[in-house]
């Protein structure tokens, strides 16, 4: 397994795969996805600025983001990182990669032939992810990162089979988290999962010392976050 770092404009990713050829495949896909998004924004500025779903008529990447936004009730840019990560992983799979993991600033898409430990930053929790054909783990935070969140969660994490939806729903979930006690947090998480259970495997929220979860999540473990393994801007 090799670990690569790549940065282009706002996109900062960590890529795990077998060799440099698959890494190059991922980089090419990331640049393709960004190009489509940037071109669409140039002609449709609302796509970039809206905090609510909007009608879109674009290519594959744009349509994925807009469909996810409609499901989650957020703006399409809430799905940008997960969508780009997913597109890169899909191209790596097409090229024959048995290990294709793209972490785009905390929005992670996994195709793996081995167990992986995926940390939930900034908490000390991690998921033990077994070998899996395709899984998205997307996290929104009201305390770190440059993405917009109107909530106060340390981490609002959504695990799903669709990365665009996982990313958009992580934003929506994070927006709901206020200065909650344990019961309020658990109630919010339970209701959110009940509303979106058709789209997600499970959800987890970390707020200060509190943790609430729902659904079918990978096993949890404690793990110290190593600064050099965290993908952030």
From Swiss-Prot:
Transmembrane segments: none annotated. InterPro entries: ApbE-like_sf, MA1715-like, UPF0280. This is UPF0280 protein AF_0649. It comes from the Archaea. Belongs to the UPF0280 family.
